[in-house]
Amino acid sequence: LELVDLRYDKAARISDQSFSNYLIKYVFVDQKVIPLSKMIEEGFFINQERTVVACNILLQVFADENVHKYVKEQIDIVWNHLKNSKEKFTPFLKAFYLIRPTETLVLLSDFIESEPARMFDVGTIKFEKNKSEKNIEDDAIKILCGFKATQQTSEAIELLLLYYKKRPDLFYEIYSALAVHFGVDIDSERQGYFVQERVVEQLCKAIESNQTTNLLLLFIRVAAQFLKLSFSR
């Protein structure tokens, strides 16, 4: 891990990962040599990847409730400071959306609501199986995929379907989100197929509420993927 000296913009590589993890905690949490919120806000726009890695180390490596609480409080400070600047807040939200899951879903709901509806007949698409894991480029869909196996799974799926109603032209990306990212994986059996049940549940609910050809086609494709007996992950 590279620790970045924000003041002088110099980097030092520390080879021992355990010591590196300890040093991050010692500097930013124990001694608070530099306020963690300052490191996050300034470091994020210097080296986003390394800043996120440092925060993840504090949240995931150290099983300390006080550390977790402090880190989340510091991220909240940056969140509040940046949220009125769309240019800076958007990339920050994409990196730290799970710190404020409810607020993130509200923001995405507002975004989807403001999106103009686009007319598109999904039936005109020649479905290609090799596109089932199409790369997702849409930021809203990417973030919603991150809510798999969380307390907000159902809400995230519901928003994906609302987005699909507005943007059927994003069929492949939304199909990929539901069938692949929310699909069967190595943890599904242990979790009682909770995520996949929520996908089917929300699809059925959407169809019952407003049955359209586009929704039916999405349901058919997702169901076909779920009914496969093998999976790759």
What are these regions (language model features)?
Residues 1-106, 117:
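C-terminal leucine-rich, beta-strand-based interaction scaffolds used for sensing/assembly
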Residues 46-65, 85-111, 120-162, 169-204, ...:
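Amphipathic alpha-helical elements of HEAT/ARM-like alpha-solenoid repeat scaffolds that form extended
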Residues 79-80, 204, 208:
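HEAT/HEAT-like alpha-solenoid repeats
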